[in-house]
Amino acid sequence: MRAEILAVGTELLLGQIANTNAQYISSKLPEAGVGVYYHSVVGDNPDRLEDCLKLALKRCDIVITTGGLGPTQDDLTKETISRVCGKKLVLHQESLNDIRNYFSSLGRQMTPNNEKQAYMPEGCIILKNTNGTAPGCIIETGGKIVVMLPGPPAEMKPMFLDYVIPYFKNKGAYSIESVILRVFGIGESAMETKIMDLIDAQTNPTIATYAKEGEVSIRVTASVLKGESADSILIPVVNEIKRRTGDNLYSDKDKTLDAVVAELLTKNNITIGTAESCTGGLISEKLTDIPGISQVFMGGAVTYSNEAKVEYLGVKEQTIKAHGAVSRETASEMAEGIRKRLKTDIGISVTGIAGPGGGTAEKPVGLVYIGLSSESGTVTKELRLSGNRKKIRTITALNVFDLIRRHILKLKIDL
């Protein structure tokens, strides 16, 4: 089944809000055996919406709309779709009662225009909205399926999961299963080269690579008859990709690198402390975003100035004078200092130049040193990164997590 997602709202066209609904729906539909072929966005204009809808119905089996179901005059999605599909709008009393109860629960008076939301296309499947006022619906017409969902993500997501996904799972003869492998330390073009023969030979399963913030994800997707397992066609391909990616593969369950590291730390009861300069606490933030990390994360220090490095971490003044704050030597003493101060199994350090200023010919913007100190010794790694300040900080954090991962798993560390 081929689907098009049609987002309705002038605010989307103006760039005032991001179209996160389409991304979310696209990520979930494959598990119900539905492939997304197109994304479209149209403003709150009934004529242009009608044009987009007719095109979508011509080229796809399924059209899923988001937005335009509210009580105001510019909320015209339901009216436009009903007209195109030849359906009358009729009052659905249960939906009207739900809307009244919603306002009552908030202690507010329902204005008359809200009644508009309870008028539904005749013969449609009603999708109850337990998080707002506008119900959604599904129309089956002429061998096509049109799904209307509210625009606010807090209303759309539960409605989509509770009603739409089960609906399509019951409809389709096929289901789609995917495995997502995540790799760090190999660029997208190099990764694609490693598996090009697999990509060229793909039929079922299919293989796709995509890059994001210094890492590469590889999606392996299989289509099987509903009720059958995809393991027999997925596992051989996944295992071959794992073999070719080697130590650079850090997850076969679509987990982030920081989540994988947090799991390794807690599973092995390895305590950790961080000393950060140019990343400004980013590594600590990413760790503390993960539930349960408190049992191993003892604390972090943002030692931005030379004085803080000396006074809090015990970095020698002579080290900074001789080698500079951005150096292997300083990174080494920072990692050792935080480990000793917090009495942890691992001490992590970062010192570098994130830009846009501060660089020299000898030490340019993007030069970063990271360090890891443990009972077995201290290692440091030099990074030469490019991009803006945010990107340099983000890629640095990923390199730190990869360093921790490799240390715990006793993998090779390229210094």
Curated annotation (Swiss-Prot):
Q: Which Pfam families match?
A: CinA, CinA_KH, MoCF_biosynth
Q: Matching InterPro entries, A to Z?
A: CinA, CinA-like_C, CinA_C, CinA_KH, Competence-induced_CinA, MoaB/Mog-like_dom_sf, MoaB/Mog_dom
Q: Which PANTHER family match?
A: NICOTINAMIDE-NUCLEOTIDE AMIDOHYDROLASE PNCC (PTHR13939), NMN AMIDOHYDROLASE-LIKE PROTEIN YFAY (PTHR13939:SF0)
Q: Which HAMAP family match?
A: CinA_B
Q: Which family does it belong to?
A: Belongs to the CinA family.
Report what the protein is called: Putative competence-damage inducible protein
Gene expressing this chain: cinA
